């Protein structure tokens, strides 16, 4: 579970991250990473999830969200204080194992962070 200080809540944060952030596409998830201008390490990074109804029923969507939150929590150490991450689950994410979803999320986040470092 993500702590309250790490959760993205405002739609403006989601919009900015998706619009201005770098995107890494995996087969079951899309990761948007926006490295903020204010590189304040005392702040906590924010993570948000987008799980559309196309993923499945409410039970399936919540299961996917729980899996993604669990993996995202373990990767907070790789993020800077001003970083914002949006994870969009694709419909195929409901059919894959937790380990496969975790691997895709780690690979996608690593790819997006590498892109952000070269652009920064």
From Swiss-Prot:
InterPro entries cross-referenced by the UniProt entry: Ribosomal_Su5_D2-typ_SF (IPR020568), Ribsml_uS5_D2-typ_fold_subgr (IPR014721), RNase_P (IPR000100), RNase_P_CS (IPR020539)
Enzyme class: hydrolase
UniProt-listed HAMAP family: RNase_P (MF_00227)
Catalytic activity: Endonucleolytic cleavage of RNA, removing 5'-extranucleotides from tRNA precursor
Entry's family note: Belongs to the RnpA family.
PANTHER family per record: RIBONUCLEASE P PROTEIN COMPONENT (PTHR33992:SF1)
Assembly, per entry: Consists of a catalytic RNA component (M1 or rnpB) and a protein subunit.
Protein name per its UniProtKB record: Ribonuclease P protein component
Superkingdom assignment: Bacteria
Entry's Gene Ontology cellular component terms: ribonuclease P complex
Keywords associated with the record: Endonuclease, Hydrolase, Nuclease, RNA-binding, tRNA processing
UniProt EC number: 3.1.26.5
Gene Ontology terms: biological process: tRNA 5'-leader removal
SUPFAM superfamilies linked to this entry: Ribosomal protein S5 domain 2-like
GO molecular function, one term: tRNA binding
Pfam families the UniProt entry points to: Ribonuclease_P (PF00825)
Known role: RNaseP catalyzes the removal of the 5'-leader sequence from pre-tRNA to produce the mature 5'-terminus. It can also cleave other RNA substrates such as 4.5S RNA. The protein component plays an auxiliary but essential role in vivo by binding to the 5'-leader sequence and broadening the substrate specificity of the ribozyme.
């Amino acid at each position: 579970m993500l702590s309250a200080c790490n959760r993205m809540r405002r739609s403006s944060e989601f919009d900015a991250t998706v619009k201005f952030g770098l995107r890494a596409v995996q087969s079951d998830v899309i990761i948007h990473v926006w490295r903020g201008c204010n590189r304040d390490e005392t702040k906590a990074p924010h993570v948000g999830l987008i799980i559309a109804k196309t993923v499945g029923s409410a039970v399936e969507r919540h299961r996917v969200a729980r899996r993604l939150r669990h993996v995202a929590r373990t990767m907070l150490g790789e993020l800077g204080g001003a970083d914002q991450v949006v994870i969009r689950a694709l419909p195929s994410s409901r059919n894959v194992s937790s380990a496969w979803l975790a691997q895709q999320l780690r690979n996608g986040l690593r790819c997006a962070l590498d892109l952000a470092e070269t652009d920064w």
